[in-house]
């Protein structure tokens, strides 16, 4: 029976089975993550002391939104004398600096067209703060994007995490424009999934989380030891996360500290941003992949699984999908031109491509539905739109396939993303109140 079975398997079948096995073996643990989050709840923390923090905001032509972020910091349920806000007006051609200064921030103007990117702006700010404001003895630095808005209890909740010993921590990343269109909704669902089914699970299991762009703090000890912000790949956040894990630093997660982020609404902006992310992930993989593999065996106990988890996060899994699709497409093309006469092999390739794409879409649909229902009350939108965007989410994720392919060959550069959604902390509080009242 087995002889007959194996005699009917072509080299195309063997290739596709191997790809499927690799994916299954590598990522099955994330299904356990989902189970962990649905079954167990993380106990809340308490703080014995309020700590002193510096906020660093890198802003490039962000006059339309930076004032809302600073205002949301100024109205925090946390002692204002323990928070100082610093804005880096990075290569601005508008009045971002004036708007930030009027809102109460200390502003540093930076002009440098050679070293472009958020990481360089952060390092510029850290160098000034550490040299000119050392007497204020900041215990940690918070990093936000200029388009963010914070829940009024954000600092109070993050302070609990810091007071309990965390050297770095990310927070709950919500979106302030989920219902702009299917693109912004796609981003929003992805970040909610990342918060709930990745970082929450990691927190429960006492392994390391990962920071993601904005809404995190880093202990001043780490910045001082590094001499500033020294992570300058296209995805400096992931590079920092990997570097921290390799050095035995566990990144925490605070699910009760809520941040609202603005998502792109045009496909062009979305393409540019996600191409940068894809290229950045490739860069981190090439620079740190081997060290993560080594860390899976050599790191101290309690930090080894974090190396594996982060390796799976940055490993170009999408690239493996692309290779599989291209391989099968070549087989189909050879069959269509008559260069390959084995009809069963060509048929196998056709079915494999359909199977691959259908399974990818189904997997993303299930993820979108699960995330939307579990986080239903956190999504500020109508029931109809929430349901509609469950069905568009798989198509949003499918667009990652060509983006990841282009990023592999294109000399991707950092490009600014325009932010124009004028939403303040009071607007978000009003939306939350409406959702709360609708339950009764």
Segments and roles (model prediction):
Residues 1-72:
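N-proximal low-complexity "stem/linker" segments adjacent to membrane-targeting elements
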Residues 32-50, 291-310, 333-440:
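Juxtamembrane C-terminal module of membrane proteins
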Residues 67, 94-101, 109, 118, ...:
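Acidic helix N-cap motif at the loop->helix transition within catalytic regions
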Residues 71-82:
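Short, acidic, metal-binding catalytic loop of nucleotide-sugar glycosyltransferases
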Residues 111, 115-134, 152-234, 275-278, ...:
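Long helical/loop segments within the catalytic core of UDP-sugar-dependent glycosyltransferases
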